[in-house]
Amino acid sequence: MADVSQTFDPQSRRVAVRPTAAGLRAVRSGDPWLFDGSIASADPNDLPAGSVAVVFDDRRVVGVGLWDPESPIRVKMLHSGGALAVEPRVWVDRLTAALDRRHGLVDDPLTTAWRWVHGENDGLPGLVLDRYVDTLVIKLYSGAWYPHLGDIIAAAQKVLQSERVVLRCARRVSPPADAPGDGDVLVGSQFDGTLTYLERGLTMSADVRRGNKTGAFLDQRDNRTLVGAACDGARVLDVFTATGGFALAAAAGG
């Protein structure tokens, strides 16, 4: 397993964030993003990404998130309405809840690749988890997740064991010194990145180490099904193909 140990304890480094009136409304409404322009003050304001941001209204805690000084979305909100201890239990609970929401996919033998975590929709802003058969691909859209990466992997393995874990990073996310980077295998044996999987019975493949996103656009599954249904008896030319998923769906439908 690659070294994904924390370079600091996020719980020991906290930023006290006091939002503007507009920012406070956003936090109270459950908005997963708190922008830099909606922050009146942050103390201290020089802590690294991944530090715990505690949002205050006067002296009352109204929300908790992850501090991201390199992004205009300065706080990725994890909780609103009070305090939250950012600890491994939180990741286990959220990954479990996300998995429960996808119960129809997990046990479907005709679909062996699916999105486990879809960022903000699952209470984990800037984090995506896609599972291809027995390989888990973690995509970071924010450097704030780096200090928590080891705990995220441990939580994922506790909830649903994977033989291999691969890290992907958005272009704007730079790994800390000596930390694993885009395309690195964090758990399991090394491989070239190409995997074969099923999507509603169609055999597809993706390069999860170098391909776009996590290798394939798993969130487009329903759209591929719609395209296939619309191609009955038609001749179709796919001129903007990436991994060929829409072309395969069209061929199967036509």
Where are these regions (language model features)?
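Non-catalytic accessory regions of SAM-dependent methyltransferases
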Residues: 1-133
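Extended active-site and interfacial segments that coordinate phosphate-rich ligands
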Residues: 70-80, 143-156
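Non-catalytic substrate-recognition/targeting regions of SAM-dependent transferases
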Residues: 117-130, 146-217, 225
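Conserved hydrophobic/aromatic pocket- or pore-lining residues that grip, position, or stack substrates
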Residues: 134, 204, 223, 240
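Carbohydrate-binding surface patches
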Residues: 136-140
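Conserved SAM/SAH cofactor-binding pocket of Class I
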Residues: 224-254
